[in-house]
Structures are given as C-alpha cells and as structure tokens.
Amino acid sequence: MVYDIMDYDIELWDIVKKEINRQERHIDLVASENYISIQAMKAQGSQLTNKYAEGYPGKRYYGGCKYVDLIEQLAIDRAKVLFTAEYVNVQPHSGSQANFSVFNALLDPGDTILGMHLYHGGHLTHGSKVNFSGKLYKTIFYGVDKFGCIDYEQLCFLTERYRPKMIIGGFSAYSGIVDWARMRRIADSVGAYFFVDMAHIAGLVAAGVYPNPIPYAHVVTATTHKTLAGPRGGIILSNGDNDIEFYRKLDASVFPGSQGGPLMHVIAAKAVAFKEAMHVDFKRYQKQVIINSQKMAKEFLNNGFTVVSGIPYNHLFILDLTNHYITGKDASLVLERANIIVNKNCIPNDSHSPFITSGIRIGTAAVTRRGFNDNDVQEVARWICNILNDISNEKIILNAKKNVLDICYRHPVY
C-alpha cells in the first residue's frame, strides 16, 4: 500500500510542493496567518479524522467515542486553564461559525446588535450586510475617533439611543488596547449582552501581553490559528458565573444548532496548541510579536507614512496610503512581486470599496514565529517603504525580492 502522497498523487503533490516553497520564500505579513507547529500538524493529520462523534464528551450519538471523549475533554481543560474560563466549547470549525453560534444562542432574528464598522476595524460577522449577521439582525455600528481610537462616547450614545440586545467588542483591523470593562459597563446600562470576538488577539491574551476580555464579557469567541498559532478553527469561552443554562444554550447552538460531527483531528491539534501556549517560550514569542509590530510601525512613521491608530499595542496595524496616492490593491500587488505578502484593507471612512481600499494591513505574528527579530522587521519595513515610494521602479522591486529571499533562507519556516 502507498502511504505517501508524493508517490500516490504526483499531480497534487506538485502543487503542494509549490505552495510549501512559496511559504518558505515569501515574507508573510498577513495578520490572520501563522505557522502551525509540526506536532499540531501531526495531530491534525492523524487517524482521528476517521472518527465521527456527534454530541459532547459522555453524550455522543455514536459508539466508539471513548478516546475521542478524552481528547476533547483534554482540549477543553487546557483552554480553561490557558484563558481562565469556566466554560469552553472547542467544536466550532471556524471563528465565523463560533460567532454564528453565539448569535444563534442569544438573539432572535430582528434583534439589534451594535458592532464595530468594517471600515473602522470590525469584522464581517459583526454586522456586515453581506454576512448572516447583517441579514438576520438589525445592525448599528460604532467606530474610531479622529485619533484612530475606539470612540467610547459614540458607543455610549448609540447604546442609549438604540438599546441593542448585544454589543460586540473585538476587531480584525484595530491596533489599540480595548477597555473591556468600560464596554461591559455600557452594555450593562441597557441590559445588553457583551460579546467579544478575540480571534486576532487570542495568543496575546493567552500569554498575558494583552488584556483578557473573559472576566468582562458574557461570552468570548476566538480562532485557534492567527496569534494562537494552532490549527484553523474556533472556540467559545465564558465566565458566566457557572450559569449552566447559559452554557447549555451555547453548546446547543453549536451542536445540533449549526454543526454536525466535530472534527476530532482538529480538536486534537487544538489541544496541542493550547499546551504549547502554556510554555514560557510562547510568552516570549508574543512579547516579540508586539515589539516587532511597534518597530515596523515606527519605521513607517519615520518614512512619512500614516499608521492608523498610531503605535500598535498588538500584532497588527493599518497603513493609510492616501497621502501616497496608492490604493491598497496596487500596494499589495506590487509588494507580492517582491515576495512580500500583505492584504489590502479599508481605512476609517474609506472612499474606496473593500476590493480596492486605501490601505494595507500588516501583521507580525507569522514572521516572528519564523524567528524575525526587531532589526529584521525594521529592514523589511524599509524595503516596503522603498517600493511604495516608487512602485514603478523595477530595480527597487527586484532588489527587495533579493533581500527577501536572503532573509527567508536565514529564517526557514520549518
């Protein structure tokens, strides 16, 4: 029997090899991406993928679940310790599905939700009209002030005026510190649920280098990739004062409410990632992620670029390219020619569509994972500045690409 994909399916393996090579030879500055460990990859590629296990540990609809019960409970217990949570559900297949489960558990169609506007740093699942959250619920948005910081006065005003049933904290493109306690007080003023999506900062929170929202929110969701550097997937957490009925609602909204059988091989990989995140090396890594983010942002500022929200306090920041007369789309395309990967991103009150944008989002979780230090990322920022200051200059692009290949060779992914 042939066990190796390279021997069985040469056509597929050829494509996979090209992607592996691309990852090794490109600098990944996409804030939502990271590199999973070999150990977690092995768990995800194990025989656990063969097992169907609808239900929860001890309450399955299938036989033969003795060992997958132990694996899921291990993942739950580790996440509880890691995030100081009373309740954890590790079954959501993604962050978006975790968010859907929270909405489905706590809201009725037509209820009002108040979330951060997509252009100001929010996420599609926080009320965008192209997403279920904007189609099933009445959506109101808060944003950032002229300094790029969350406008809490606007948030308070909108809360009093529209009395939402849920206020959403969290973001996909915001680089400041969020005052979770203040947001909870605002939610409490109208009896609203306070729900936090910490998908982007879960690793930072686990390491204790960014404020933990769990003591303040009714419910929190996260992804297990991004800064947590685990497999692609979602989790739901809560410190709901041991409100068993509240936890049951959340569980029922995941299964059977929105999913069938959980992906046991992915849950095993989540368990590995949670163990890794408990190690002292993980905290050092997350500290360096923020150091690298701040170092890059300062380099851009020193070169005349605009950084939305100023110096970042997490792993990401947005470059506003308006004063350089470049769209985010053009910037991302020209940088990719130099083997530097970013994503185009809207800026507050953007005049361009999300397909074009006036900015790019830069994240340091992945490059830090492969060993880039603050001097390395400062160099990378300089190369980006050189390219964006003269995007038609082929010599600059080729020189940057040469430098990228050299630094990637010195810092392999695996």
From Swiss-Prot:
Its main location: cytoplasm. Catalyzes the reversible interconversion of serine and glycine with tetrahydrofolate (THF) serving as the one-carbon carrier. This reaction serves as the major source of one-carbon groups required for the biosynthesis of purines, thymidylate, methionine, and other important biomolecules. Also exhibits THF-independent aldolase activity toward beta-hydroxyamino acids, producing glycine and aldehydes, via a retro-aldol mechanism. (6S)-5,6,7,8-tetrahydrofolate binds at residues 118, 122-124, 353-355. SUPFAM superfamilies: PLP-dependent transferases. Its EC number is 2.1.2.1. Homodimer. The record marks 225 as: Plays an important role in substrate specificity. This is Serine hydroxymethyltransferase. Belongs to the SHMT family. Pathway: One-carbon metabolism; tetrahydrofolate interconversion; Amino-acid biosynthesis; glycine biosynthesis; glycine from L-serine: step 1/1. Keywords: Amino-acid biosynthesis, Cytoplasm, One-carbon metabolism, Pyridoxal phosphate, Transferase. It comes from the Bacteria. It holds the Pfam family SHMT. It comes from Blochmanniella floridana. Its cofactor is pyridoxal 5'-phosphate. It is found in: Cytoplasm. It catalyses: (6R)-5,10-methylene-5,6,7,8-tetrahydrofolate + glycine + H2O = (6S)-5,6,7,8-tetrahydrofolate + L-serine.
